[in-house]
A protein has these predicted regions:
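Class I S-adenosyl-L-methionine
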Residues: 1-59, 70-167, 172, 325
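Alpha-helix N-cap/loop-to-helix initiation residues
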Residues: 65, 112, 143-144, 244, ...
Length: 326
């Protein structure tokens, strides 16, 4: 590993290589303002390994690689190790420099490659060797990404860390599907709900997730406000594709009208994005017929009827137009 290159700001490695190949001393030839920016340590002194590395919990966004933030990109370039989930776009993984170690710690419902406790332990072990780690997560690390558990573990071992936000799945799905999450005429607020519930052991030792189910009555009360009111609440379910039939049943059972509009956005903001528009009554059957793969975001509420089909070709030719079924 070239420690000099590892320290250069992103995009300037090639400049340093070019100058070196022409026997040019970059410290003498660069303009004084750029010379000051680099400082001689970038070229003359190898980086000293700290006793403990730092950890950056970074959100990779909802799917489209171009939605990665500039700060996230810079920190990825400067990392010693990048640990990433299965939700991270492969195009973002390609941005990781070759000298940076890549560790896949993906977790997917029903197909765990690593338990959360093992991921936390691995981060600590690597950081204690003095390496700086980027922990790359899909969406935003603070929203249903279990960042709090990782922060707890790092704090226990007195390892410094920082969090870099990413565009959460709900925002990405909303924008790329043309569905507002709030609307001054019909939705004053929005609520994010995880459908991937924590399993709890009963007294007999059996796993039971029903104890951790959301307060359906409260959800329906917010979403089912008076039709002439703008106080209704938009409901957004994360990771609910496999449970969409149960989710719709729960909403109906607690009083949400079957005619309430629902949108399911599959693989939002990627080239594989699909959008299905339906109602509480029929949306589960529709997404089954369309063979959605996930991850998917489900939006419930009047805002779905305020949808506009956006021209995604204005953003990228790699993102397909949406498919609709009313």
């Amino acid at each position: 590993m070239n420690t000099e290159n590892a320290l250069l700001p992103w995009g300037l490695t090639r400049l340093q290589q070019f100058l070196s190949s022409h026997n040019v001393n970059p410290l003498n030839q660069l303009p004084h303002w750029l010379n000051d920016y680099f400082s001689k340590n970038h070229f003359s002194q190898p980086r000293k390994r700290a006793d403990k590395g730092h950890v950056y919990l970074i959100g990779a966004g909802p799917g489209d690689a171009e939605l990665l933030t500039i700060k996230a990109h810079r920190l990825i370039q400067q990392a010693d190790v990048v640990m990433f989930d299965w939700l991270v776009n492969p195009d973002i993984i390609k941005m990781i420099p070759r000298h940076v170690e890549r560790v896949f710690v993906g977790k997917k419902c029903g197909r765990h490659s690593m338990q959360q406790a093992d991921i936390c332990q691995l981060m600590v072990e690597v950081a204690l060797t003095g390496k700086n780690i980027v922990r790359l997560k899909g969406g935003d690390p603070a929203i249903f990404a279990r960042a709090a558990e990782e922060c707890d573990m790092l704090a226990q071992h007195q390892i410094d860390f920082a969090i870099v936000p990413g565009i959460t799945a709900a925002s990405g799905a909303s924008a790329y599907a043309g569905i507002p999450l709030t609307h001054r005429e019909c939705a004053q607020s929005v609520r994010f709900i995880t459908a991937h519930l924590k399993s709890v052991k009963s007294a007999t030792g059996e796993l039971n997730s029903s104890i951790e189910e959301p307060n359906w009555q409260a959800l329906v009360a917010g979403a089912n406000a008076s039709a002439c009111s703008n106080n209704r609440e938009t409901l957004v379910f994360y990771m609910g594709l496999k449970r969409i039939d149960i989710i719709m049943q729960r909403l109906r059972t607690h009083g949400l009208p079957e005619s309430t509009p629902v949108a399911v956005i599959d693989q939002a903001s990627t080239a594989q994005q699909k959008v299905c528009i339906g109602t509480v009554k029929n949306i589960a059957q529709q997404v089954t017929e369309q063979k959605f793969q996930g991850p998917a975001v489900t939006i419930v509420g009047e805002v779905v009827n305020r949808r506009h089909v956006v021209n995604l070709s204005l953003l990228s030719q790699s993102v397909n137009g949406v498919s609709e079924k009313a």
